[in-house]
Swiss-Prot record:
GO terms for molecular function: ATP binding; protein serine kinase activity; protein serine/threonine kinase activity; sigma factor antagonist activity. Its EC number is 2.7.11.1. HAMAP family: Anti_sigma_F (MF_00637). The gene is spoIIAB. It comes from the Bacteria. This is Anti-sigma F factor.
Length: 146
């Protein structure tokens, strides 16, 4: 049986931790390992930070949307903004690329997300926004003994 949640919040940097914790609480029902939980929190953090800093350019009037769906032991995440979009996705997905070097960002967000999931798809259109699709399979071994 699938279980689904939807979340929308203002594009404020202080809401990044809120998004991370909310998704973590949602997947807790599957009793993920600490490693899986850390990876999921990192994926959410990277995608939400990208939406706030790059998509909305720190405009708090923007909204970030997250949908999380659990099917068996698979997590599907959709993190979406309606910001400025990404003009060159191939370039943006290159390790160490950043569109804001003045912020001393490492440009590793997409690379990190790719390494922590089974599937990462990014769709973006200039002046329409960006949607990040993530699929992550959780191990069959649960974190705690029952």
């Amino acid at each position: 049986m699938a279980n689904k949640m939807n979340l929308a919040f203002s594009a404020l940097s202080e809401n990044e931790s809120f998004a991370r914790v909310t998704v973590s609480a949602f997947i807790a029902q599957l009793d993920p390992t600490m490693e899986e939980l850390t990876e999921i929190k990192t994926i959410v953090s990277e995608a939400v930070t990208n939406a706030i800093i790059h998509g909305y350019e720190n405009d708090p009037n923007g909204q970030v949307y997250i949908t999380a769906e659990l099917k068996d032991r698979e997590l599907e995440l959709i993190i979406r903004d309606e910001g400025v979009g990404i003009s060159d996705l191939d370039e943006a997905r290159q390790p160490l690329y950043t569109s804001k070097p003045e912020l001393e960002r490492s440009g590793m967000g997409f690379t990190i997300m790719e390494n922590f999931c089974q599937e990462l798809k990014v769709i973006s259109e200039p002046m329409i926004g960006t949607t990040v699709y993530v699929k992550k399979q959780l191990t069959t071994t649960k974190a705690m003994c029952r």
